[in-house]
A protein has these predicted regions:
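Active-site helix-to-loop segments that bind/position phosphate- or nucleotide-bearing substrates
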Residues: 1-112
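Structural signal for hydrophobic packing residues in well-ordered secondary-structure cores
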Residues: 38-45, 135, 139, 212
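Conserved mixed alpha/beta catalytic, RNA-binding, or beta-rich assembly cores of soluble enzyme
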Residues: 83-147
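Short terminal or interdomain "cap/linker" segment that borders an active site or interface and mediates
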Residues: 142-217
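Short cysteine/histidine-rich zinc-coordinating motifs and their immediately flanking basic loops
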Residues: 220-221
């Protein structure tokens, strides 16, 4: 169960602005506020990750390992239909960023709170990309290919499977817990699964294009 102590040297400003619900075309937005939020996020982030490769039975949709899990939802089963093993991962940037963001809002510093929250989201997605790349490299060493990562709540994969999925990953090892409402805590955390097979790798679609939540304010097509 490899641990990943990632590093964050930068945060994608374009992604950060998207998560903040701000168009990159808005030229008059104060750059110093953006830069300040990025600096604060980088200073407060506590990047941690965990991942492992587990056997997978595509006929039954079951992940093997110490805590076997049978997946439900047509979209995830279809996504993994050619996989005989899967990479599972969980990452977090810790809770200090969300505490700081909450403090900004509490003090009436709404812009700072919004931008810091968005920077944290961009940061944890970047961390997930790093672990995703590790799994891709591990699969390639045995001549296998991966498909893009998929998280509980995508498509019709019910988020209610989050507790069992995180147990299969071992997410508690890096301080990630699941709330009674199946949300991850710390809030700026990600869990995901990546199919591994002999099939040629498929290009990853735009993240939003793969999601059916048409009303999402972060949607970017």
């Amino acid at each position: 169960m490899p641990l990943f102590n990632g590093t964050l040297f930068q945060i994608d400003q374009k992604e950060m602005m998207r998560y903040a619900g701000l168009s990159p075309k808005v030229k008059e937005f104060p750059q110093d506020a953006i830069d300040s939020a990025i600096r604060e996020a980088l200073a407060l982030a506590e990047p941690r990750g965990i991942w492992q490769i587990l056997p997978y039975d595509p006929e039954n949709g079951t992940i093997g390992g110490a805590h076997p899990l049978t997946l439900t939802g047509r979209s995830i089963l279809r996504h993994l239909s050619h996989a005989w093993s899967v990479g599972v991962l969980a990452v977090t940037v810790g809770e200090e960023i969300e505490k700081a963001s909450g403090a900004h809002f509490k003090n009436g510093e709404y812009l700072q709170g919004l931008l810091l929250d968005a920077a944290a989201t961009a940061a944890v997605e970047h961390l997930a990309d790093q672990v995703d790349a590790l799994i891709q490299r591990e699969a390639a060493r045995s001549g296998q290919h991966t498909v893009w990562r998929f998280s509980p709540g995508y498509g019709d994969w019910p988020v209610t499977q989050q507790p069992d999925f995180c147990r299969a990953i071992g997410a508690e090892t890096i301080g990630i817990h699941v709330t009674d409402h199946a949300m991850l805590s710390p809030r700026k955390s990600v869990s995901a699964i990546i199919g591994i097979s002999q099939c040629s790798a498929r290009p990853a679609p735009a993240k939003c294009r793969a999601c059916g939540l048409m009303s999402c304010p972060f949607r970017n097509l």
